[in-house]
């Protein structure tokens, strides 16, 4: 459960990232294809279960309509993509898996509190002027992906941020340790 958020968070790194114990699963294939589409250099040794990601030469823009579909973790790309590109625009909500489509509202609320501007003019638009800013947020309910969105947005933001009612599962803690190591 930790690998997808960590792969999304790798977009926050200014240099190459090396990861191990990467399983060859469909969602990772989709995420790797998306990363390559936006200009990332990926070296994935499936036998050794290692991956080297370098996002230092990303395209200057991208079509967010090309976010990986059919995976719940697509929403975890919002904060890293905003950090990199300053704006994203979506035709529709990212679709989920058989477990159900995840709500976007908690993610949008968090991004807004951390300084993002949200618009709904026929498309969902999210933008930031510079960097995310520190904020305090009380989550209505514990959510792993909402907590991960908050942590990724706050990690490189200006000032201190606090999320009350955060999820604390081991894979959320793995993401936090990864971000601290960058």
Regions found by a protein language model. Name each.
Residues 1-182:
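Structural preference for solvent-exposed beta-strand-turn elements
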